Amino acid sequence: MAVQRTLLVVKPDGVERGLIGEVVSRVERKGLKIVAMKMMRLTREKAEEFYSVHRDKPFFGELVEFITSGPVVAMVVEGDEAVSVVRLMIGSTDGRKAAPGTIRGDFSLDIMKNIVHASDSPESFEREFRVLFSESEIVEW
């Protein structure tokens, strides 16, 4: 088993609906560790950098508009195979198709307003982490 870190972001719809505690609770109950967490509003510049892999896709503008529409809660989650474990916990991108029991399956009916974002690979985590956090914000415990 490989200990990894991954990024998990509660998007503006999740914050607005009061689901921060639910997301944190699921992470903790799974046995993963939160080693950094903060609430913030992403600037357009940060949002464009964060979603840069989607820059050439038709939904890029809408994605940036949505993620900057309200506060988000970003956290760094650590644990065995954290990237794949968290991806399984959040479910399919489209909340209408996400399995019951997943965060999106339980709380989302949309592909954009789908409560959370999570890194899809260790490489994505490294890129996304640098946009939202600095190493000094990691708390080892």
Swiss-Prot record:
Its cofactor is Mg(2+). PROSITE patterns: NDPK, NDPK_LIKE. Its EC number is 2.7.4.6. It holds the Pfam family NDK. The keyword Nucleotide-binding applies. It catalyses: a 2'-deoxyribonucleoside 5'-diphosphate + ATP = a 2'-deoxyribonucleoside 5'-triphosphate + ADP; a ribonucleoside 5'-diphosphate + ATP = a ribonucleoside 5'-triphosphate + ADP. The active site is at 117 (pros-phosphohistidine intermediate). Keywords: ATP-binding, Cytoplasm, Kinase, Magnesium, Metal-binding, Nucleotide metabolism, Nucleotide-binding, Phosphoprotein, Transferase. SUPFAM superfamilies: Nucleoside diphosphate kinase, NDK. It is an enzyme of class 2 (transferase). GO terms for biological process: CTP biosynthetic process; GTP biosynthetic process; UTP biosynthetic process. HAMAP family: NDP_kinase (MF_00451). Major role in the synthesis of nucleoside triphosphates other than ATP. The ATP gamma phosphate is transferred to the NDP beta phosphate via a ping-pong mechanism, using a phosphorylated active-site intermediate. This is Nucleoside diphosphate kinase. The lineage of its organism: Archaea, Thermoproteota, Thermoprotei, Desulfurococcales, Desulfurococcaceae.
